[in-house]
Amino acid sequence: MATTRYEPVAEIGVGAYGTVYKARDPHSGHFVALKSVRVPNGGAAGGGLPVSTVREVALLRRLEAFEHPNVVRLMDVCATSRTDRDIKVTLVFEHIDQDLRTYLDKAPPPGLPVETIKDLMRQFLSGLDFLHANCIVHRDLKPENILVTSNGTVKLADFGLARIYSYQMALTPVVVTLWYRAPEVLLQSTYATPVDMWSVGCIFAEMFRRKPLFCGNSEADQLGKIFDLIGLPPEDDWPREVSLPRGAFSPRGPRPVQSVVPEMEESGAQLLLEMLTFNPLKRISAFRALQHSYLHKEESDPE
């Protein structure tokens, strides 16, 4: 059994994708993160992995060959146990001690310097642009799966896992936060890579605020909080055949970004609004956001 070569050290946490363990590779001395998932038995002779899982893992392996600096390393994949119904697969990732949530919490008041935020955003967008260029939609970006190394390198984690984990998640329902979800996801409409850019906008604002931007407790409540900032979108932008009609929300106009992120200068506020654009077809892409002037000019120092 391949995972026996790793010595468990501690349980890191439990998330949408099951329990994550910190372990040590005795051969190299390096720490790794172990994520186990149950997938349905493929039903092939010998009960192999389902084709969909093999395909998803192959995609993660292919991405690994690029060694993108802002994407967490996948070191190994091993099938560890099986029953008649399912197979337990363990994904072995490089281990990084802190996520963006911890990193933000550790920053002394008044929070991160603007130049640090810009550097984090450039790295974050670079990793995301790489995933999108390879047709991977993350679907669950939040501060907890954006990792930050001790030298300030940003690495995206938990991408490409949504389909691998669909079977296990159906078996073990979990409460997934709505706070970083794009409107089209909240409305149960079709979605693609722009959903991630909405999440980026929420996280960008949170780097300044040090608290989440939209904290809804249901899909409708979350949408209401979004419209309190960006205004109720025009009828033409409302997707067809979705879970909630536009008429369910009272008309309201947009508020200035500085009313919720007062520390953000005008150019940053403009970039944020391009990320928090209701219509996904009009939302800025990771590639275009990387070119935005805000991320490339030095902050004017008032002192």
Swiss-Prot record:
The region called Required for binding D-type cyclins is annotated at 50-56
Q: Locate the N-acetylalanine modifications and list their residues.
A: 2
Q: Which residues form the Protein kinase domain?
A: 6-295
Q: Which residues form the active site?
A: 140 (proton acceptor)
In terms of one coarse class, where is the protein primarily found? Answer: cytoplasm
**Pfam families per the UniProt record, alphabetical:** Pkinase
The domain of life is Eukaryota
**PTM annotation (Phosphoserine): residues:** 300
Instruction: Provide GO CC annotations from the record.
Output: bicellular tight junction; chromatin; cyclin D1-CDK4 complex; cyclin D2-CDK4 complex; cyclin D3-CDK4 complex; cyclin-dependent protein kinase holoenzyme complex; cytoplasm; cytosol
One Gene Ontology term from the biological process aspect of the record = animal organ regeneration
Tissue expression pattern = Expressed in fetal and adult lung. Also expressed in brain, heart, liver, skeletal muscle and testes.
Q: Which UniProt keywords apply?
A: Acetylation, ATP-binding, Cell cycle, Cell division, Cytoplasm, Kinase, Membrane, Nucleotide-binding, Nucleus, Phosphoprotein, Proto-oncogene, Serine/threonine-protein kinase, Transferase
Its EC number(s): 2.7.11.22
What is the uppermost EC class here? Answer: transferase
Q: Name the positions where ATP binds.
A: 12-20, 35
Q: How is its activity regulated?
A: Both phosphorylation at Thr-172 and binding of a D-type cyclin are necessary for enzymatic activity. Full activation of the cyclin-D-CDK4 complex appears to require other factors such as recruitment of the substrate via a substrate recruitment motif, and/or formation of the CDKN1B ternary complex. Inhibited by INK4 family members. In resting cells, the non-tyrosine-phosphorylated form of CDKN1B prevents phosphorylation at Thr-172 and inactivation, while, in proliferating cells, tyrosine phosphorylation of CDKN1B allows phosphorylation of Thr-172 of CDK4 and subsequent activation.
Catalysis performed (reactions) = L-seryl-[protein] + ATP = O-phospho-L-seryl-[protein] + ADP + H(+); L-threonyl-[protein] + ATP = O-phospho-L-threonyl-[protein] + ADP + H(+)
Localization recorded for this chain is: Cytoplasm; Nucleus; Nucleus membrane
Q: Could you tell me which residues carry Phosphothreonine?
A: 172
Molecular function, one GO term: cyclin binding
Provide the family line. Belongs to the protein kinase superfamily. CMGC Ser/Thr protein kinase family. CDC2/CDKX subfamily.
- UniProt function note: Ser/Thr-kinase component of cyclin D-CDK4 (DC) complexes that phosphorylate and inhibit members of the retinoblastoma (RB) protein family including RB1 and regulate the cell-cycle during G(1)/S transition. Phosphorylation of RB1 allows dissociation of the transcription factor E2F from the RB/E2F complexes and the subsequent transcription of E2F target genes which are responsible for the progression through the G(1) phase. Hypophosphorylates RB1 in early G(1) phase. Cyclin D-CDK4 complexes are major integrators of various mitogenenic and antimitogenic signals.
Per UniProt, subunit arrangement is: Component of the D-CDK4 complex, composed of CDK4 and some D-type G1 cyclin (CCND1, CCND2 or CCND3). Interacts directly in the complex with CCND1, CCND2 or CCND3. Interacts with SEI1 and ZNF655. Forms a ternary complex, cyclin D-CDK4-CDKN1B, involved in modulating CDK4 enzymatic activity. Interacts directly with CDKN1B (phosphorylated on 'Tyr-88' and 'Tyr-89'); the interaction allows assembly of the cyclin D-CDK4 complex, Thr-172 phosphorylation, nuclear translocation and enhances the cyclin D-CDK4 complex activity.
What this protein is called in its record is Cyclin-dependent kinase 4
* Species of origin: Rattus norvegicus
